[in-house]
Amino acid sequence: MMEDKIIHTPRFDEQRRMRRKKRQRLQLFIFLSIVAIVSLILIYMFTSISYVKKISVNDTSINSTKTIKEKSGIQSNMRIYSLDTKQIVSNIEYLDGVKSVTVRRHFPNTVSINVEEYDVLGVVKDGEHYHPALENGQILHKHNYAEPSEVPLINNFSSKALNQLVKVLRASDTAIINQISEINFIPKVEASHRVQFYMKNGLEVIGDMRTIDNKLNYFPAMASKLKKDSNGRILKPGIIDLEIGAVFIPYESKQAEERRIELEAAMEERSEKDKAELEKSVEKLKKELNQVKKNS
C-alpha cells in the first residue's frame, strides 16, 4: 500500500501557529478573568466593603424611622450577604400599627426597608393625650398624636362600637372622611346605635351606625345644594339627619333646637355612665387590694 503524503507549505504552518497562539491567548484571558472574579469576590466578602453602610426606610406615620431601624436589629458590623431578611421582617412586624414589611439588599452595602402601616382613621382623646385609632379597630395607647387636624376626633366609643365605626369609615369615600372633624357615639334607649359627625364645613350629620355606611356618601350632594357665601361658607349651617331618611334641619329652626337638646342630653348621659363605670372599676380594684393586704 502506498502511504499518503502530507505536504506542509510555509503558509499552512503559519496559520497553525496563529490558531495556536489565539487559543492560548483565549485560555489565558479566561484564566485571568476567573482569578480576577474570585479575587473581587474574596475582597468584597472579607473586607469592610460588605459591611452594612446604609439603611433606607420609607416614610411612615406611626413608627419613626429611628424606631424601625432599631427594631430591625441590623448593625453596622453585619455583612450584607449574611443578613437574615425573614428575621428582620419578623422583628419589625411586632411594632404597633405595622401591616406588612419588605426588606431588600442592594449591592454593595445598602438595605432598604419598606413598611406598610394600617391607616389612621381617627384619634381618641385620653386626658391630655390623643391616641391613633387604626383601620383594624386597634387603638394605640402607647402612641401620642398632636391635637387632631387631618383625622377626626373619636369620642365615647366602646370596643364593639369602634369596630362598627371602622367598617363605616372604610366603606366611605376618603374625601368624606377628610371632611369629618369629630365623631361621637351617643346611644339612647330608643336609638341604641346613634352616631354624630361634626363636619369641617359647619354641618352636623346624625345617623344610625347600622345604616350610616350606605348613607354617608350622600353628604356631599346634600351639602352642595345649600346656599353659600362668596368664600364658599354655608350661610345656614344645620343638621343632616340620616337616621331614618335624609333631611336637612337648619340650626335656627325649632326642630334643630329640640334635636340639639336631645343630643346634648344623650352625650351627658353617656359621660355619666362612663364615669359611673370607672368609679365602679376603681372601687372593685380597691377591694381586691385590701383583700390581698389582709391575706398577707
Swiss-Prot record:
Keyword Cell cycle: yes
Keyword terms of this UniProt record: Cell cycle, Cell division, Cell membrane, Membrane, Transmembrane, Transmembrane helix
Gene3D superfamilies noted in UniProt: 3.40.50.10960, membrane protein fhac
Cell cycle is among the record's keywords: yes
Domain POTRA: 50-118
Transmembrane segments: 26-46
Main location: membrane
Biological processes annotated in GO: FtsZ-dependent cytokinesis
Extracellular-side positions: 47-296
Chain's role: Cell division protein that may be involved in stabilizing or promoting the assembly of the division complex.
UniProt family annotation: Belongs to the FtsQ/DivIB family. DivIB subfamily.
Name under which the protein is recorded: Cell division protein DivIB
Top-level taxonomy: Bacteria, Bacillati, Bacillota, Bacilli, Bacillales
Gene field: divIB
